[in-house]
Regions:
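P-loop NTPase catalytic core of nucleic-acid-dependent motor ATPases
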Residues: 104-215
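Conserved small/polar residues in nucleotide/adenosyl-binding loops
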Residues: 228-232
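N-terminal nucleic-acid engagement/recognition segments and initiation subdomains in replication
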Residues: 1-130, 145-149
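Walker B catalytic acidic pair
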Residues: 222-223
Length: 232
């Protein structure tokens, strides 16, 4: 993109965007999906504000918007939708709920992102190998071919699950040690961010197990005995 195009793009106003829309013979904004998409793609406030989160499967607001958001989560709420509809109504005369819903779906899908994948791809390796020393460093395990191999396998599986969701990996890394040894802390470190970690699996027969798994990267099953108390 040329510098001139970038400057012009950044200087767009709501009036500029209105000029890009289709209007009726009487000058009213047509209630079309195309018009709504044009607004969401070009409005100085809404542009790139709504993205589909491939990890959670939900739509997120990822930048500042002209209404108060009391929830720390980026996930779009009903209140966000109401405020967005009011913004489109006030600035562009777009009021059709069907049109707005379709426009949001199209644009968010065009702007989809994966927070963990984006994080991984932002990293630059400093040339220092760490996997082979992870278990000895954090948990005091003996450094051996086994501890090195099992950690490499687990980390490769974690990365693979991000790039190929659902890839087969049915091996559990089991840590045995006294309470307070740092086992849970270790898994939290692996998850990088608290919201990507969960230890909320009390029972395998929990009817909400799939919902609890969603949106997390590293899952800790606190007690292995749960495997034996749940029906197979």
């Amino acid at each position: 993109m040329e510098l001139e195009d970038i400057v012009n793009e950044e200087m767009l106003t709501t009036e500029d965007v209105n000029d890009m829309l289709e209007h009726t013979d009487k000058g009213r904004t047509k209630q079309t999906i195309r018009n709504c998409v044009t607004v969401l793609q070009n409005d100085p406030v809404l542009k790139k504000a709504i993205k589909r989160n491939e990890l959670s499967g939900r739509m997120d607001i990822v930048k500042e918007v002209p209404w108060e958001r009391r929830n720390n989560s980026p996930t779009v709420t009903d209140t966000d939708e109401y405020n967005l509809k009011m913004y489109l109504e006030e600035h562009y005369e777009i009021t059709s709920e069907r049109v707005i819903k379709a426009g949001i779906d199209i644009v968010s899908n065009e702007n989809k992102y994966h927070p963990i994948r984006d994080y991984l791809e932002s990293l630059v390796w400093d040339g220092i190998p760490r996997i082979e020393n992870m278990l000895p460093h954090f948990l005091g395990a003996e450094k051996s071919k086994y501890t090195i191999g099992v950690m490499k396998m687990h980390m490769l599986a974690a990365i693979s699950r991000i790039y190929e969701p659902g890839i087969k990996y049915d091996i559990m890394l089991c840590l045995v040690g006294s309470q307070g040894a740092g086992k849970s802390t270790f898994f939290k470190y692996l998850a990088i961010k608290e919201e990507w970690f969960s230890d909320n699996l009390d029972h395998l027969d929990d009817e909400n197990i799939y919902r609890k798994l969603q949106n997390h990267w590293i899952i800790e099953m606190g007690e292995i005995c749960l495997l034996y108390t749940s029906p197979s």
